[in-house]
Amino acid sequence: MPANAPLLQFTPPLQPATLILRYKRFLADIVTPAGEALTIHCANTGAMTGCATPGDTIWYSTSDNPKRKYPQSWELTQTQTGDWICVNTMRANELVNLAIEKNQIAELSGYNFVRKEVKYGEENSRIDLLLQAEDRRDCYIEVKSVTLLQQQCGYFPDAVTLRGQKHLRELQNRVVNGHRAVLFFAVLHTGIKQVAPARHIDRRYAELLVQAQQAGVEVICYGFQLSPDGIALNTRLPLLLDEMLSSENAE
């Protein structure tokens, strides 16, 4: 159990259901314990490999916004192997921001201001979080949600991401311009104990990640404790780059 207080509490509590099918990227069909069939919103445009297996137990929230066509939102998956996954990718930025504000991430402490979605860079980007203080360099933070588990390792990305490649170039340029730059992997799958770039999925992203780190971009990985009650920050997780570098040198 993490010593940190919960960052996010689900109010009202999440409700369980059985996943029937995820489709059209943004929708999923479920059946509640009472037998009610629902179509719910899925705020995840990724491949969701291993996160959307029919028959898994999913947990959903319900919005009180009367204008929403699909008031229920898919938040968590409880896999048949007992792992928990936060499939709502919008939560990653929120959780990292809350952890910084609550001073739970030592590597990112000591800043007075947190700004969100600030325009920056040579490729017309927006940074997820910009930390500022009078006596420190500006700190640019790009947050990525990690949920792909393969062979006991968490991988990012789960599909080719030109946008993610652009973000790595932008972060590297921030360092060149004298700023601090951080790639923060928010590991939202409780079965993941270590993280690596998914070279087998997006080779260019993996190459850019190595280049960015060598240029001074910091890569920070943290796990989270997930439950239908809420989400808390867990421990820092290792990033595996040495094996990838060794395999590249051998080619």
Curated annotation (Swiss-Prot):
What's the protein called, per UniProt?
Sugar fermentation stimulation protein homolog
Looking at the UniProt entry, the stretches that span the membrane are: none
Q: Can you name one GO molecular function term for this protein?
A: DNA binding
The organism's place on the tree of life at top rank:
Bacteria
- Which organism does this record belong to? Yersinia pseudotuberculosis serotype O:1b (strain IP 31758)
The entry sums up its family as follows: Belongs to the SfsA family.
